[in-house]
Amino acid sequence: VNLGEVGFLNAVDPADAVETVERLLAELRAGDPLPIRGLDRLAVTGAAVDPAINEIVIQAPTRGAAAPLALTIDVDDHRYLQTRADGVMVATSTGSSAYNLSEDGPLIHPAVPAMVVTKMADRAHHPAMVLPTTAAVQIAVEGPSEAVVVSDGRTRTTVALPQTVTVARHGTSVALVEPTPHYFDALEKLA
């Protein structure tokens, strides 16, 4: 309930939360199946942050032209690109409708098993890359002195540079009861 502004984890307005939970509990007691979807999570090595349902962000402590990071991004040990940017995020399909979308990343249907690498204020304007959830994204970060690694906008840690951070699918998923079961009903919030 209300974990973001446009993302799909806030399918219920706070004013409707009690009524929605009561309806779902009544359906459960009646033996009706609940609309449950498994959510992939992202795990990080190279920085101490919690697994993420939406995205992992690696960014400069301050954003803007004065503090870009030098990023080398490999996917499964193959070079994807080198660039200078304010940061980079790796988002799940569910997270593609949140911060990723605000950074001009693609919107991915939540049933598609994918993750997306989106650069933040990329100086060379590289497009985002959609990857399978089996991929491991290695991000070598260089910059003035440090970077911040953030999981779902909630847990963060500062890392000294240079540092390599790897983002990959976590071994377990999270079950989500979806009171708005159809993806396109939730898209109305993006208009």
Please identify what each model-predicted range represents.
Residues 4-9, 108, 124-125, 174:
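Short gly/pro/ser/thr-enriched loop/turn and capping motifs at secondary-structure boundaries
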Residues 81-125:
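Gly/Ser/Thr-rich active-site loops/lids in small-molecule metabolic enzymes
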